[in-house]
């Protein structure tokens, strides 16, 4: 990318706007080196990083890295086998700390899908061992005593010597107070001294280290203290030597990791720059543009980043459009619009967000060229025109169909007629070679060129005829018009002079009137578009409000369901605790009578919550599938028994075989059940209670008492009913025959007395009639 375009667009000033959002020197360095690139995939990767950083901030509003200084020079010193200073080690200590914090942050990161940033986060290494070693230096740069046993020992000796020195001085201070100018202990040349009056200097034996400016006081180190101070000085030298050894040891530990540390610093700096881009985007209401597959551009509400309170403008540069010519008078904002396009494109190709609305689109150009401003060269004795033309020639020689060219006041600085002709010829050459170009000019001849030439479009900047000031609103498709007559009239020029001037340029006046009508139509269209945008924004806000209400409702519903589930779990827990208590009571007894086990099982059954089968949604749904037919399997709603439909009677009544009993049922008294679905239902967990039985016989659903004596029949009946209850049988058959009726009556009396028998009756005629009793248990 040509360096001159960056200077003309003041790209460095734009980059300076990102400085307040940076936290690391490495990020600052990367920003300083940032320039536009022409690699579409690389630019898209930058944008993906930025979008993912936005996703991180949705979940973590205060994501930060902490201040980091540049470590590149320190790493070079490590590579050269040099030892690092305390300050350099502190910088690396901070780097290790931030690296560890970022690693932990990424490990805990949830609800954010990362692709581009994932690679960055996962490359950052943590060094807990090095981090632990560098704790020997605190944040103030003091090497802690625990850094080595030797340092700790030396400092303990220094402390003892200093204490002894102070004690000795205090004693001398008391004894020779009359000779002192002040009752205090001073320090000179790192030695503890006493301020002695000059007239008594020979009264205090010792070494003179200094004298006051007036000469009235001399600072003497008492002789008794000299040897003690010598020892202290030696210990302090030993301390410095030991600290140097510790710094060398720490440097040696860091040396093998210099490459990884340098890489960590770069990764953190890059993350910092991505973070700064996001914060800038939020603060400036910028956006990440879409990259076109062709050379088309679309800027929605684009703003110039270096202007305070800039006017936002739309720009549509279709793929087949080669040239846009902005015509009209000076000071209308033509150059600002030119630079707005250039900066948006340069920023985007540098991976930066642009000051425009969402939906904006940019292209990728191999070269962006501009001729903007007064380039007069005094040194080369070139006029403004010559300077511009020299630069234009260079641009034309370098540009191709993958270039974007920006011309400000093309053809200016020479004869207007010749300048206009040159401008048209240059634009025509660029149009024929399909090079995207935007040019500003005040030559009226170029308006006609823009109207008559294919793939060339006129544009202008709106002007307020009332205030006589430019509005800086970009009007694409409308050529600029002169406002000289209107301005002159409003400033007080005589009307007859204005009319005479208009008569001299009658044709131009007609053109201006047409242009004025186009301007009005454009402004009206823009107002309608702005109204549509306002409606869209209102709809968007409404949709967000509805979505928020829906989310709140869903959240409340989930909370209620969670509460209900919690209550259900509490009920189940209570039931399980009660069942465990019952089972514990059963297991505490070595021998249990059958009726005790039956009673316990009955209590366990009562723990289960009652459910009305008539309200069972699954069964209701099954019933709705189709009308019942003969042979269908059913469940009797009243007591949950399985049966089969035998025949359809009148009034929607059915005859059903339920066990050994035939029943007459209404259609709302049973539900259809599919065998396939029944097979797929999960089996219920059951608690098995094992009874010590006298025999090894299994459970029986039928008891035959024919030919039995009364006592024998009653014993077998009692054992049979107990066994049936233990095995959860709901229905049993008792065959007693007709005979004399003694056994039949005895069976009836027994069943009436047994509280676990719900009901009983004779079997149907085809199943034994009065010779067989069917008992329902529960």
UniProtKB/Swiss-Prot annotation:
SUPFAM superfamilies: DNA repair protein MutS, domain III (SSF48334), P-loop containing nucleoside triphosphate hydrolases (SSF52540), SMR domain-like (SSF160443). InterPro entries: DNA_mismatch_repair_MutS_C, DNA_mismatch_repair_MutS_core, DNA_mismatch_repair_MutS_sf, MSSS, MutS, MutS2, P-loop_NTPase, Smr_dom. GO terms for molecular function: ATP binding; ATP hydrolysis activity; ATP-dependent DNA damage sensor activity; endonuclease activity; mismatched DNA binding; ribosomal large subunit binding; rRNA binding. Residues 703-778 form the Smr domain. SMART domains: MUTSac, MUTSd, SMR. The keyword ATP-binding applies. ATP binds at residues 328-335. One of its GO terms (biological process) is mismatch repair. Its EC number is 3.1.-.-, 3.6.4.-. The keyword Cell wall biogenesis/degradation does not apply. It comes from the Bacteria. Keywords: ATP-binding, DNA-binding, Endonuclease, Hydrolase, Nuclease, Nucleotide-binding, RNA-binding, rRNA-binding. PANTHER family: OS10G0509000 PROTEIN (PTHR48466:SF2), OS10G0509000 PROTEIN-RELATED (PTHR48466). Belongs to the DNA mismatch repair MutS family. MutS2 subfamily. Homodimer. Binds to stalled ribosomes, contacting rRNA. NCBIfam families: mutS2 (TIGR01069). Endonuclease that is involved in the suppression of homologous recombination and thus may have a key role in the control of bacterial genetic diversity. Acts as a ribosome collision sensor, splitting the ribosome into its 2 subunits. Detects stalled/collided 70S ribosomes which it binds and splits by an ATP-hydrolysis driven conformational change. Acts upstream of the ribosome quality control system (RQC), a ribosome-associated complex that mediates the extraction of incompletely synthesized nascent chains from stalled ribosomes and their subsequent degradation. Probably generates substrates for RQC. This is Endonuclease MutS2.
